[in-house]
A protein has these predicted regions:
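Class I S-adenosyl-L-methionine
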Residues: 1-152
C-alpha cells in the first residue's frame, strides 16, 4: 500500500531525527524513512530480497549460526554480502586472524567486527569476507556449545 507523507509524519520525523521528507507519495514506509538515513541490519534469513534491499539503500550482513550455515557463503557471494560470525579463542586484546577457513573449505579475509558495529563502511572487495566477532561467553555455556556456535 502506498504511503503519503503528511504534515504529522513530516513534523515527527523532522523533530525526532532532523530528516526532511519531501512531500510525495512513497511506495512503502521504509522508502520514506530511508531518506536521510543509512539503515543496516544483520540477518540469518537467506530468503530476503537482497536486490531490493540494496536498491532501497538497506545494508545487510548475513549472520552465521542458523539453519542455513551450509549455504550462507553461496548466498553472500551471489549478492555481494559479508558474513558476521563468532570466532573461538580470540582474546579481546588480540587481533582476529587475517583469514578464516569456512566450513565450505574456502578461505575468507576477515574484518574485525568488534571494532565497530557500523557495517556499511566495510565495503565490497569483490569477494565476501567474514566479520569476525570474538565469542562473548554466556552463563552456563559449555566449551562444546561455545565451539559449536563459532565458525572457527
Amino acid at each position: 500500500e502506498k504511503v503519503t507523507e503528511t504534515s504529522v509524519i513530516f513534523r515527527f520525523v523532522h523533530l525526532s531525527f532532523g530528516v526532511y521528507l519531501p512531500a510525495q507519495e512513497y511506495t512503502m514506509i521504509s522508502a520514506m524513512v530511508m531518506i536521510g538515513l543509512q539503515p543496516y541490519d544483520y540477518t540469518k534469513r537467506i530468503d530476503r530480497d537482497f536486490d531490493k534491499a540494496r536498491h532501497l539503500g538497506y545494508h545487510l550482513t548475513l549472520s552465521w549460526g542458523g539453519k542455513h550455515d551450509d549455504c550462507i557463503f553461496d548466498v553472500a557471494e551471489r549478492y555481494g554480502l559479508n558474513v558476521a560470525a563468532p570466532v573461538y579463542g580470540v582474546k579481546k586484546s588480540k587481533p582476529v586472524p587475517d583469514t578464516i577457513k569456512a566450513p565450505n573449505g574456502e578461505e575468507y579475509e576477515t574484518i574485525d567486527g568488534d571494532v565497530t558495529d557500523w557495517r556499511r563502511d566495510d565495503g565490497w572487495t569483490g569477494r565476501s569476507r567474514i566479520v569476525a566477532l570474538r565469542l562473548k561467553r554466556t552463563p552456563g555455556q559449555t566449551e562444546r556449545l561455545a565451539k559449536a556456535f563459532c565458525i572457527a
